[in-house]
Amino acid sequence: VKIRPAGLLDLARIEEMHRSADIRLSQAEPPAARLWSLLSSTLSAILPLSQETLMYVAEENGKVVGFIQASGQPLGLDLRRATVLQVLNLQVAEESDSEVVAPALVEHLSDQALERGALRLFVRLPERDPLLPAFRLRGFRQYATEVVVYADKPEPRSDRFPDGVRPVKRGDNRMLYQLYRKGTPQGVSQLEAPTYREWRALHGGEWTGRLAARGSDKQEYVVDRVEIVGWVKAERSTGARPDTLNFMALPEGPLPGELADYGLSLLKDSETPAWSSLRHYDSHMIDALRGRGFGVLLTQLLLVKELAIRVPVREKGLVPSFG
């Protein structure tokens, strides 16, 4: 198998493979699950070649039999400055051996990303995806599980809302970062956003698994009790997709349930289904939403490969000089 950069002449074949995979996925997944995958950069997304992406193809006997694509994060970041990349797509033609082609593509992408100065490669994969072994065999490890919950008609349980709830204002970002660090296992936050600056660059995007709001009809609130202990963002749908709820909350007493009810109140009178993307460590919010008509739509695995280990520079000691 020969791996090389994708060129314009490869696009027709790449699009053919992508359409074929699209048809198979559409038959296997509920429509809402497929829509979520398309919106959240789950493995199977594809960007035009002209955008800031790396794309490589696998060739056998002169024919393209697979391709892999990755982008900088946030999406569209100049690749010359990107230290974190996300794998958007990996596909192998049906007639080819995916156990040979897929790992070769993953390995080549890893090598090229490292040469460009990237520190980490991330990928979001549906549970039990047949391509999962290709990543595990090339050094990717799972660091989190993402759970997407969905309700055709969500039902609030109470009109009791959290004490201290108020609209987000300028200056809240640093306190929101502290909330993120408190509610996120250290092993995850150190990978995704070890500094406030990195968190700001990624906050609100698909990188953390929380669907980004794309419309203008969105509302954002925090629960302020000297420190911020909860956050909710509600976006009413402006098209075919469901309404979106995003949450961060400390697992304290009635707070998750009250925050869930408050989030649903922001969508009152909406006839549209709703969904929310949460992590395995957000079990308190998942349970709160389950009690309000939500069910698990799909589970996805978040994997990472460390391309380069950052080692702190040893400080030089000052040695007294005599004489």
PLM feature spans:
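Conserved beta-strand in the GNAT
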Residues: 55-57, 63-72, 86, 222, ...
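A short beta-loop-alpha structural element at the N-terminal edge
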Residues: 2-25, 163-191
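Conserved acetyl-CoA-binding loop-helix of GNAT-fold acetyltransferases
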Residues: 97-111, 137, 253-267
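Active-site/acyl-donor-binding loops of N-acyltransferases
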Residues: 138-158, 271-323
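A conserved beta-turn-beta hairpin within the catalytic core of GNAT-like acetyltransferases
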Residues: 73-87, 236-246, 297-298
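A short, internal acetyl-CoA/4′-phosphopantetheine-binding micro-motif in the GNAT/acyltransferase core
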Residues: 87-100, 244-256
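Conserved GNAT acetyl-CoA-binding A-motif
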Residues: 113-126, 269-280
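Active-site rim helix/loop that mediates acceptor-substrate recognition in acyltransferases
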Residues: 27-55, 60, 191-218
